[in-house]
């Protein structure tokens, strides 16, 4: 039997990869390049539309634990991430074009794959074939209308993207290279600000013109991608404890810690492009250029991609889907990725791995399985399928119910999670 996957984002490609390696036939429907969402630019699969960072690799962080679990499950997304990584201190960041090309090339190499470049408008509910909806948070058009009827409506939140600038336009006489606390290999460019420079930047930022968005509601902003202007409006010093915090950074030109620092992170392997860390925004493009050029060292910044805001859509998973992310009524329709309420690149990919695993089992005549609740992946799936009031959720320690003090949890939880996942995989053999 052939499996149909709608969407070749991070979740869709993981579902496909698992099934293709098991020898099953897969047909992927990808609307690009026939149609692009407001935030997608490339024709290739697994496009990263926000940051190019896949977060920390430290096992003292939930994101690091999630990566280790995904490695055990042979994640395509992680395999390509490690092949296309760029320096980013303790974080795993990638050259987004090479990363997307890597994923596409791997999937295209399978003989049992069919790639259909078209926009899907609906799924035939009378079909016996398995379908996976992995259309992501920017699902729209006729398919969104059909999906809304199938699921009883959508939930929403707003997300934003940071600008990217050219390295050649940075004045290194005013900036310095370095990582916080001297840890790392000098992966960030730092633009230091005096108190006067910060206050001017702050005044102009909070008074800058923004793009109006239909049905925009500040209460629906996702906490990890708050626009910088929204953070600023919460208080004059709010940025100093957020994306502009200077802690751990000493300006070699003065020997002192600056009043504020704006950091730039590599966007590509060659280091020709840098994104402005924490500068997600919905300012008008003309205002973005004006505000960015107030930053010391960026007075002549060439902006290669402007920041944008977009509405993210997801379904009410606990009400609509079962514990295996199948539709409760139409058991041949699965959902994967951010459309289910997970938030984050790797969280979406992990969701796809889980769905791919269970579809493979079903096609092999076996029963689907739940992931252990004391794994990061299992806890995440457990949350989105059982939450009383579903809110977008990323990997975090609070998802796993173990009786430990906070510091002890940070030190030891990775051992519990990884052992649980290893035992689970051994059980499946």
Curated annotation (Swiss-Prot):
Cellular compartments per GO CC: cytosol
Broad class of where this protein is predominantly found: cytoplasm
Record-level Gene Ontology MF annotations: flavin adenine dinucleotide binding; tRNA (uracil(54)-C5)-methyltransferase activity, 5,10-methylenetetrahydrofolate-dependent
Record keywords: Cytoplasm, FAD, Flavoprotein, Methyltransferase, NAD, NADP, Transferase, tRNA processing
Catalysis: reaction(s): uridine(54) in tRNA + (6R)-5,10-methylene-5,6,7,8-tetrahydrofolate + NADH + H(+) = 5-methyluridine(54) in tRNA + (6S)-5,6,7,8-tetrahydrofolate + NAD(+); uridine(54) in tRNA + (6R)-5,10-methylene-5,6,7,8-tetrahydrofolate + NADPH + H(+) = 5-methyluridine(54) in tRNA + (6S)-5,6,7,8-tetrahydrofolate + NADP(+)
Cofactor: FAD
Top-level class of the enzyme under EC nomenclature: transferase
Cystine pairs: none
Transmembrane residue ranges: none
GO biological process terms held by the UniProt record: tRNA methylation; tRNA wobble uridine modification
Location in or out of the cell: Cytoplasm
EC numbers: 2.1.1.74
Cross-referenced InterPro entries: FAD/NAD-bd_sf, MnmG-rel, MnmG_N, TrmFO
Pfam families named in the record: GIDA (PF01134)
Domain of life: Bacteria
List of residues binding FAD: 7-12
SUPFAM superfamilies noted in UniProt: FAD/NAD(P)-binding domain
Record's function text: Catalyzes the folate-dependent formation of 5-methyl-uridine at position 54 (M-5-U54) in all tRNAs.
Similarity comment: Belongs to the MnmG family. TrmFO subfamily.
Protein's recorded name: Methylenetetrahydrofolate--tRNA-(uracil-5-)-methyltransferase TrmFO
Organism of origin: Thermosipho africanus (strain TCF52B)
